[in-house]
Regions:
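An acidic/histidine-cluster motif and surrounding catalytic segment
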Residues: 1-131, 139-170
Length: 170
């Protein structure tokens, strides 16, 4: 598993002070937990950017035409027939990194400011908020969505299960 994490947040030090461990440890732990929970048969790769509200707003505007800061953005590289359905991937060489053979899942962009603000708003730790947003984004990278009520309920249950299994309780 390769997780490339870039930190471009002026608030990263503030976030670190509110976490019980390094952001990368939580991110890696949750990415692995999601892949395990979803029975992913492949070694995978994902890129994660921790940034501030100004940058995530700019990315949101450029990529989604929404001029607003948000907590997390997900940019999947794989188009799943149905969520976490890996069937037929062995023949789709373009989905894999040529040197490592890892399945290229996509990109996650996190706002350090939103992580801290939402943890306070929801009355839980920054660890839990970072874990939640990482799990949420990873499920998007695996083809899940929450546009319809049934999809939302499925995704929310998976998030709860993954976070509970990893020990990140509300």
């Amino acid at each position: 598993m390769t997780v490339n994490i870039e930190n471009e947040s002026e608030n990263l030090q503030k976030l670190r002070e509110k976490l019980s461990k390094e952001p990368g440890e939580i991110i890696n732990e949750i990415i692995l937990a999601v892949l395990d929970h979803e029975n992913c048969p492949y070694e995978c790769a994902a890129d994660v950017l921790i940034t501030d509200d100004d940058m995530i707003r700019q990315i949101n505007k450029e990529q989604r035409d929404i001029d607003k800061a948000t907590d997390v953005l997900s940019f999947p590289m794989v188009d799943f027939a149905s969520p976490s359905d890996f069937e037929g991937f062995d023949d789709r060489y373009e989905l894999f990194e040529p040197d490592s053979g890892e399945l290229l899942l996509g990109d996650i962009v996190l706002s350090a400011e939103h992580i801290m603000a939402q943890a306070e708003e929801y009355g839980h730790s920054c660890d839990r908020e970072l874990a939640f947003l990482t799990a949420h984004s990873m499920l998007h990278l695996l083809g899940y969505d929450h546009m319809e009520d049934e999809e939302r309920e499925t995704m929310e249950q998976k998030q709860r299960d993954i976070l509970d299994e990893a020990g990140y309780h509300r």
